[in-house]
């Protein structure tokens, strides 16, 4: 649903085994993938072997950033932003991550972040936190977790504001971004009774 065109370049940070890479490659002029794992990157390369517009780099974003010579129309962080403190060793790793990737945006480019909502409905309904598998860990603001964290809408909005002058649009996939049944936005929030089942 992103309006990516064949004239645009995409940087996919945290591409993993490539579940999104092929879709991006079919829409974009080129896709540059970065992932920490050589094994996941090998799977991605095999999975998308028929896409001649995909380049895969293995390593931490900090380590491969200097090799990025292009500007990108879209930079995606799908299930990755929550791990920024492991990649960026600063006092404000999430703010710094956005500042660093913004340097690689083309004029008018967009950053796309898909991340769990720390206060999401599924956690209130009794699901364990996606990353650490503990009940209420995110709802209680991660008292026992240091390596990963997700944010409420307000917290994420504050991080984005601190990082720079970004124009933001929030979307709300239900029940989550991994397997959305419906995607809401501030222009179209759920009506009474829509969140059943």
Language model segments and positions:
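A conserved beta-strand element that flanks and buttresses the S-adenosyl-L-methionine
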Residues: 76
């Amino acid at each position: 649903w992103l309006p990516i065109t064949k004239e645009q370049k995409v940087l996919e940070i945290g591409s993993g085994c490539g579940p999104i890479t092929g879709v991006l490659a079919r829409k974009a002029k080129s896709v540059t993938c970065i992932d920490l794992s050589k094994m996941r990157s090998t799977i991605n390369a095999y999975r998308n072997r028929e896409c001649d517009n995909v380049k895969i780099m293995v390593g931490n974003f900090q380590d491969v950033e200097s090799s990025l010579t292009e500007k990108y129309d879209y930079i995606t962080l799908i299930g990755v932003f929550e791990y920024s403190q492991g990649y960026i060793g600063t006092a404000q790793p999430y703010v710094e991550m956005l500042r660093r990737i913004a340097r690689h945006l083309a004029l008018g480019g967009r950053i796309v972040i898909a991340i769990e909502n720390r206060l999401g409905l599924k956690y209130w309904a009794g699901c364990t936190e996606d990353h650490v598998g503990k009940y209420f860990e995110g709802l209680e603001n991660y008292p026992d977790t240091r390596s990963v964290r997700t944010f409420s809408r307000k917290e994420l909005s504050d991080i984005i504001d601190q990082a720079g002058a970004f124009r933001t649009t929030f979307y709300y996939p239900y029940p989550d971004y991994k397997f959305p049944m419906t995607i809401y936005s501030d222009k179209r929030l759920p009506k009474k009774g829509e969140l059943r089942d």
